Amino acid sequence: SEMCIRDSNLRGRKMNSLRKRGIIIFSILSLVIVACGGAAEEEVVEETVEEAVVESLDSPAVTTATAVKTGTGVTAEPCPAEIGGVPTGADQNKGCIYLGLLNDYTGPYAPAGPGLELAQRAFWLWANGAGGIGEYSVAIREGFDTGYNPQKHLEGYTAIKDEVAALAMSLGTPQTLFILDEMDKDNMVGVPMSWWSGWSYKENDKGLIVEFGSQYCADGMNAVDWSLENLGDIKTVGIMGFAGDYGSDWAAGVAKAAEANGLTVAWTYTPPSTEFDVAQAVGLMVTQPVDAYFPAISAGLMAQVAGGAAQQGLTPFAILAGPSFNDAFVQEGFPLKGLFESGAIYAMGLGVAPYEADTPGHAVMRATMSQIVESANAFLVAGWSSQYHLKGVLEAAYKGGDISRAGIRRAAANVTVSSDGMMEPRELGQDRADTAAYIGIPDGSIGSGQRVLAFN
């Protein structure tokens, strides 16, 4: 991806060892093995208490307005007490800001969808209890099943857009890109559940996408650099992935770092996800052996590729993109548990500190989630952390006196957001990608299935 490659800050930062720290990494797909791989017219209500001067959100300083402009998806009536089987924690004396949810319940990422959604709803349960957004609580409406299909994604967007002020989640990069023009017409800001490097640049996302975590391309670069520093003599590598935002973005980062380090790329296999052939992937490893390979595929296919290569007597180092790993790989009874714990396989995180990390944000997440579900899986971390930056955007919009969709969009274009330590603070709208990365080794003795080795 050109977006990733052109950023000179994406590589060359040495990853710090975590061998002496008891921190556990998470990988984004870790519940079960999955084979995945015209403008809307807003009705604006204004309550004018007194004439007030409100500074633009383009200014570093924003005064708190005495009158707040509202619009589509914002009501004076309180949020429901429960949506989607999860309490909203809404203050019944406050109004409600509604968010939309474009999820996958029946497609390749169906195993991920419920966990992501549960954590997002739990986040706002906590946030509402902590005061909400000024005189408003926040609630996520019932999710729409897109099946990870762009056309269904558009259908879902069309169905919910007149009822929400922003999107709590739009799962999938191609799917989100497919609706981006409509989002632009509607001033609809949204959180992606993907880590495409292009989300960091306004020329791609029109200033509408509230990204979080590191990007696939940066992770690919960091994976190569770390492997060369820690895994011995690596001279020949292979690159494997799905064509598109995920695999191609990762492949671009791996290729760039390989070139910079003088490595030979023996082969690159990046077909569309629907055309990925395990036999062909294993065949490349057999006919053109490599010292290490870097896959960005689904967890289900990853197990087949690693297992197929091992059956042929091949166990080169493998440094996986986060979605290629699954904690089921190291659970008791899984046939390839020994292979994944052999020291030949490693996996990147996705730029969010792991579940057991010692930050205020993680502590709040664990305390809240433990009241709802007994689990430490990665979907919860990804879902919860995805909402922090949106919360910051809504807070900025409210402070600026405009929580209409136009006001929310303006806030998203220029605001510094934080996450109680879960991620580094980020200034949105700056055409700059995050580079924080985690890398871990599969370990079945740990709840999340991986032990962190390094971060940067």
Short names for language-model regions:
Residues 1-5:
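Short, small-residue-biased leader/transition segments that mark boundaries at the very start
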Residues 37-45:
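Bacterial lipoprotein signal-peptidase II cleavage site
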Residues 74, 79-93, 100-121, 143-150, ...:
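Extracytoplasmic "Venus flytrap"
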Residues 82-85, 164-269, 317-342:
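Extracytoplasmic ligand/sensor domains, especially the bilobed periplasmic-binding protein
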Residues 84-87, 111-118, 130-203, 212, ...:
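Beta-alpha junction/loop-to-helix N-cap segments that form part of ligand/metal-binding clefts
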Residues 252-255, 299, 304, 354-411:
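Extracellular/periplasmic ligand-binding modules, especially the Venus flytrap/periplasmic-binding
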Residues 309-384, 442, 450-454:
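Extracellular/periplasmic periplasmic-binding protein-like sensory domains
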Residues 389-456:
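Extracellular/periplasmic bilobal clamshell ligand-binding domains
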